[in-house]
């Protein structure tokens, strides 16, 4: 095992510390503290390459702490990890504290490890360029070589042939569509439920295309308010809005010559959709606060778990933008629609778990694979990955038996939807639809014991979208977790 760097985790919850340590310890030395005071004491005597800090702590916010770290110990790369998405906190974090990455809960282990690896790499590149006496933005031959090698690895990692599926799987047709899309410089819209692998397909399309040697950039459009989303994508000038303390290059410029993946595009507002449409039509962006436009050459791959055609008919999504994005539509099947792939995917996940948990003898009992086949997997492949990791953590033996929690979920049937008088009465269509939507959400909350992540996944909503609906229907008291704390 090769340790790539030292990571400082600052989180007041011991369970969160342990979860991060477990995921990162394979590649990094992980130091955990529960508050800012202990973190500062540690920074005085340790060389730390990157800091992962929770936003909400008892006596001080993560942003406030990292702002001070930036002044006193500017070298470590700073990252915020949180389940909260207040716009002012995010804006302040990205600008005042010089945050490299804002990571939202629930985070995915593989993505988190890659993000931290990139942060450590950035630390080393900064130190190298300081030693050479040049600005970190200057592209040296060494940096070009690092980037070239990294993209070569990515091309192998995200090849279409590495997408797990059997010959009888509906994924076979999806992959063929993806290969065709890769051959042409055309916008692609990937639809499907949360956790089906939309980003994986988007990466395969990029790395199978003529743009493979340029950047592939990801933005989750459902996680940020309009102003910050525009700043992220189009860039901004210093002073363009509250918290814009420096010029910022947008992701469209970062992706120039490459591909940008716009996840959860269906969560965007009509006002933002107008601005995105212009970018697609004119191939140019205007950073917030700037007077001049800038030309960009970027391929757009968008994804959504919503029925965008229905959203268009309802007036919530612009028709002209939909047709721009859906020049080449591809639908990802749910995991329950490809049961023949479940054993293959499960074995692939288990192989990764063996390595990351250093338990090479782990194996599935036959009963576990049978249980996997019975379950409907509302969270799709992502839920299957999480379930296998959980099984490995809880297992005292090398054989992973049928998980009892999964068995209880299998036996848990949906209660009948409550009968509302307005559904059968003379109420307006809007009122009837709202009543039905509230009933569905209540039913799902009950079935999942109020777990926000599972409910959002099952309903095909982002956590932000679900929180809004819980507030609208006064269902916040039915939810558990950190959604409203």
From Swiss-Prot:
Job of this protein: Probable member of the two-component regulatory system involved in the regulation of the hydrogenase activity. HoxA is probably phosphorylated by a sensory component (which could be HoxX) and then acts in conjunction with sigma-54 as a transcriptional activator.
Keywords of the record: Activator, ATP-binding, Cytoplasm, DNA-binding, Nucleotide-binding, Phosphoprotein, Transcription, Transcription regulation, Two-component regulatory system
Matching SMART domains: AAA (SM00382), REC (SM00448)
Protein name: Hydrogenase transcriptional regulatory protein HoxA
Binding annotation for ATP: 192-199, 264-273
Keyword Transcription: yes
GO molecular function annotation: ATP binding; ATP hydrolysis activity; cis-regulatory region sequence-specific DNA binding; DNA-binding transcription activator activity
Record feature DNA-binding region, as residue ranges: 451-470
An example Gene Ontology biological process: positive regulation of DNA-templated transcription
Native species: Bradyrhizobium diazoefficiens (strain JCM 10833 / BCRC 13528 / IAM 13628 / NBRC 14792 / USDA 110)
């Amino acid at each position: 095992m090769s340790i790539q760097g030292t990571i400082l985790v600052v989180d007041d919850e011991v369970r969160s510390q342990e979860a991060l340590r477990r995921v990162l310890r394979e590649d990094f030395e992980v130091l955990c503290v529960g508050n800012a005071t202990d973190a500062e004491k540690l920074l005085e005597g340790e060389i730390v390459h990157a800091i992962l800090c929770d936003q909400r702590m008892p006596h001080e916010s993560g942003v406030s702490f990292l702002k001070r770290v930036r002044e006193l110990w500017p070298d470590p790369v700073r990252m915020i990890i949180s389940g909260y998405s207040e716009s002012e906190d995010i804006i302040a974090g990205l600008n005042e504290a010089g945050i490299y990455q804002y990571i939202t809960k629930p985070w995915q282990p593989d993505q988190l490890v890659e993000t931290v690896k990139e942060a450590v790499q950035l630390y080393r590149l900064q130190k190298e360029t300081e030693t050479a006496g040049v600005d970190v933005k200057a592209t040296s031959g060494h940096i070009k070589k690092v980037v070239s090698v990294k993209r070569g690895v990515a091309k192998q990692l995200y090849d279409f042939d590495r997408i797990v599926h059997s010959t009888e799987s509906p994924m076979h047709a999806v992959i063929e569509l993806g290969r065709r899309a890769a051959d042409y410089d055309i916008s692609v819209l990937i639809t499907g439920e949360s956790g089906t692998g939309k980003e994986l397909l988007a990466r395969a399309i990029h790395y199978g295309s003529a743009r493979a040697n340029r950047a592939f950039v990801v933005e989750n459009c459902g996680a940020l308010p309009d102003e910050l989303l525009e700043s992220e994508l189009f860039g901004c000038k210093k002073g363009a809005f509250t918290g814009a303390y420096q010029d910022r290059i947008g992701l469209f410029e970062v992706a120039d010559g490459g591909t940008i993946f716009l996840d959860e595009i269906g969560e965007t507002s009509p006002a933002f959709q107008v601005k995105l449409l212009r970018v697609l039509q004119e191939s140019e962006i205007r950073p917030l606060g700037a007077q001049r436009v800038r030309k960009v050459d970027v391929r757009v791959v968008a994804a959504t778990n919503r029925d965008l055609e229905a959203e268009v008919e309802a007036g919530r999504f612009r028709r002209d933008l939909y047709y721009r994005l859906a020049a080449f539509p591809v639908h990802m099947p749910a995991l329950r629609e490809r049961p023949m792939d479940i054993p293959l995917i499960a074995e692939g996940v288990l192989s990764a778990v063996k390595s990351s948990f250093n338990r090479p003898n782990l194996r599935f009992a036959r009963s576990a694979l049978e249980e996997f086949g019975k379950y409907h997997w509302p969270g799709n492949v992502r839920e299957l990955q999480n379930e296998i990791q959980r099984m490995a953590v809880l297992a005292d033996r090398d054989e992973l038996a049928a998980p009892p929690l999964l068995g209880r979920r299998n036996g848990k049937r949906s209660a009948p939807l409550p009968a509302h008088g307005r559904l059968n009465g003379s109420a307006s269509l809007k009122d009837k639809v709202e009543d039905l939507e509230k009933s569905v959400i209540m039913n799902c909350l009950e079935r999942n014991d109020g777990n926000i992540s599972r409910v959002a996944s099952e309903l095909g909503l982002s956590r932000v979208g679900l929180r809004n609906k819980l507030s609208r229907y006064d269902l916040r008291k039915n939810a558990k977790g950190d959604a409203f704390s």
